Design a protein with these regions (language model features):
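NAD(P)-dependent Rossmann-like dehydrogenase/reductase catalytic/cofactor-binding core
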Residues: 108, 112-119, 144-193
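Glycine- and other small-residue-rich loops at beta-strand/loop junctions that grip anionic moieties
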Residues: 49, 70, 165
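Internal alpha-helical scaffold of NAD(P)-dependent oxidoreductase catalytic cores
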Residues: 4, 11, 38, 42-46, ...
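Short coil/turn segments at secondary-structure junctions
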Residues: 23, 123-126, 187-190
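Rossmann-like NAD(P)(H) cofactor-binding subdomain of soluble oxidoreductases
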Residues: 1-65, 81-83
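Glycine/charged-rich beta-loop-alpha catalytic/anionic-binding loops adjacent to active sites
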Residues: 18-20, 97, 185-187
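A generic alpha-helix surface/boundary motif
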Residues: 33, 136-137, 174
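Glycine-rich beta-alpha junction loops
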Residues: 25-27, 52-56, 74, 96-101, ...
Length: 193
């Protein structure tokens, strides 16, 4: 991710450094930085925003009703993004907790892998529901320890994103976890064997 963003940094600045919103739900694999941290560093983006929530791309593209949170330290910019993104089937809510929205979007992927493993092992819905519920509690604890607001983890970028990622076969992480639970090796899963 960092290498790609570095390639476009000059073009971003040449375009006048417009407001930017990240929909990436993860961390840099080397530095563990959140995407807005990387955008601020490499692009010198001022108040980069983050978008997260229960938003599976194929459903959103089909116009299925979708709601997300857009977080930005600049409240006026968050509202402007909200206006730009909100339409008939897509609703954006705002937050000032960029860190929490990004952490919710990233941490839910770990829980989704575990939920898939539950499915692959045949543990049933009771175990999966307990895992998802306890996973949300752990996401919240870690997020708060890293400086996020606890209430962020009870919104669209918390249980909203967590539920869709843990329950939908259209996401990557839950099906990957299911394959792991059935005994497929990580190397095979990643296409390395």
């Amino acid at each position: 991710v960092r290498a790609t963003l570095e390639r476009f940094a000059g073009a971003y600045r040449a375009a006048g450094a417009p407001p930017v919103v990240s929909a990436t739900k993860g961390f840099d694999e080397t530095t563990l930085e959140r995407m807005t941290e990387i955008l601020a560093e490499l692009w010198r983006a001022e108040h980069p925003a983050a978008l997260s929530g229960p938003s599976i791309a194929p459903e959103t593209a089909r116009g299925v009703p979708t709601a997300v949170t857009i977080a930005c330290a600049d409240e006026a910019r968050a509202r402007r993004f909200q206006e730009l993104f909100t339409g008939d089937a897509f609703r954006a809510y705002t937050s000032d907790d960029v860190r929490g929205v990004e952490l919710g979007g990233a941490l839910k992927n770990v829980i989704a892998l575990a939920a898939g493993i539950c499915d692959g092992l045949g543990f049933g819905n009771n175990a999966k529901a307990a895992l998802i519920t306890r996973g949300l509690a752990e996401m919240t604890r870690l997020g708060v320890a890293l400086g996020a607001h606890p209430q962020t983890f009870y919104g669209l970028s918390g249980p909203g994103a967590l539920m869709v990622t843990c329950l939908s076969p259209q996401t990557r992480n839950r099906p990957a976890g299911e394959r792991l639970g059935r005994g497929e090796g990580v190397a095979h899963l990643l296409g390395c064997s």
